[in-house]
Amino acid sequence: HVDEWSAQGRINLFGDTVKVQEMQSEGGAAGAVHGSLQAGALTTTFTASQGLLLMIPNMYKIAGELLPCVFHVSARTLASHSLCIFGDHSDVMACRQTGFAMLCEGSVQEVMDLSAVAHLTALETRVPFINFFDGFRTSHEYQKIEVMDQEDIRPLVPMDKVAEFRSRALTPEHPVARGMAENPETFFAHREVCNPYYDSVPAVVEKYMAEISKITGREYKLFSYYGADDAERVIICMGSVTEAAREAIDYLNAKGEKVGMVSVHLYRPFSVKHLLAAVPKTCKKIAVLDRTKEPGANGEPLY
């Protein structure tokens, strides 16, 4: 749709037409995003699988320089013992250490609603986001959805933060030096300076989820609970599996069982406080459903 909107000259929230630039590879696309952000242009990109891995070196730079952007990823598996192009979380989990926040959706409607949360939070906190959903299972699903009106989102955009971002753009009129080399005694200290930005992310995501919930009538939380209030067995999962899990939970609870599910939306930064608040106090057993194989680890990434 972005190509169509650009070709049609559709105007975005900022009164501009969107320029779509296709690069020679995903590595080139990530480099172009980095340069575009440094020049003060709000920029986003779309990728998946091995293509996302090619972007990792630039992702470290983008996150390290606190450049707000969103990478939309239809999460897909990575070729290992054989090629497979279908959905799992191997690609996005390879990016956990880059400094990108990670927001996950489980349905086409959730993608519509929460993508806005990723963009708004990135602008306010300066932390870049991976906004991901399951490849094929969600990315290629035909589903009737409710589309938010642009005018409903406009009041939520932190225009002061947009102005701040643009004021930091590289320009010959206000020359600055960025991206220099540092020795260990200063590098480690400067690397820690970003912590307050990441600490602020869960609260800001929660704020914008509440605003989107007001617009759509659909409730969103960092960790959404579904099931019996007095559940004794709970599964924790992320992505399209949550849709099937709801059906199973309804069926089992109707038969007298006490089960529930916690759907993870904000995976990074991970808020233990919000997770514990979502799990019923009656819970005795928890099962974590992962979609990534991490050989040699004590548990998979979500676990």
Language-model features: locations:
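Short glycine-rich or small-residue beta-strand-to-loop segments that form or flank ligand, phosphate
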Residues: K19-E22, T43-T47, A101-E105, E232-C237, ...
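Glycine-rich beta-alpha junction loops
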Residues: R76-T77, F133-H140, D160, G239-V241, ...
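Short, solvent-exposed amphipathic alpha-helical segments in soluble enzyme
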Residues: V2-W5, Y60-A63, H119-T121, E146-D149, ...
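Conformationally flexible catalytic loops at phosphate/diphosphate-handling active centers
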Residues: F14, F129-S224
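Conserved thiamine diphosphate
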Residues: I85-G135, V147, M159
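A generic structural motif
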Residues: L13-V20, H72-S74, F132-D134, K258-Y267, ...
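Thiamine diphosphate
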Residues: H1-A94, G99, A116, F136, M209-Y303
